């Protein structure tokens, strides 16, 4: 897995190609359904797709907060305070959850 702060479009393209190669091995009904779901998630136009992307991003932050600070590089300190803000802004609940995760991040940094 490539950290968010190092991921470039070429990495996104590789991941997408690998996913579609795998999906093409499924029976045609499932292949079409999975492709449609993937497209819905990547377009982020539906509420479900927005929630999916927000939760995926928040989960990354929670896991990051669980890691030891010795594994963090300097740019992660700032990124962890702003990452996913744009992905939760459509929901008051997810915005509040993002704030709680940010507070955990700040508490972790202050313990250092």
Report each predicted region and the residues it spans:
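Alpha-helical, largely C-terminal catalytic domains
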Residues: 1-112
């Amino acid at each position: 897995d490539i950290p968010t702060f190092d991921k470039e479009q070429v990495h996104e393209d590789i991941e997408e190609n690998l996913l579609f190669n795998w999906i093409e091995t499924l029976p045609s009904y499932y292949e079409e359904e999975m492709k449609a779901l993937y497209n819905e998630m990547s377009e982020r136009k539906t509420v479900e797709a927005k929630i999916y992307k927000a939760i995926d991003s928040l989960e990354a932050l929670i896991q990051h907060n669980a890691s030891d600070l010795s594994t963090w590089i300097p740019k992660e300190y700032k990124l962890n305070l702003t990452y996913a803000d744009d992905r939760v802004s459509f929901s008051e609940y997810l915005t509040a959850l993002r704030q709680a995760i940010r507070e955990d991040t700040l508490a972790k940094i202050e313990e250092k």
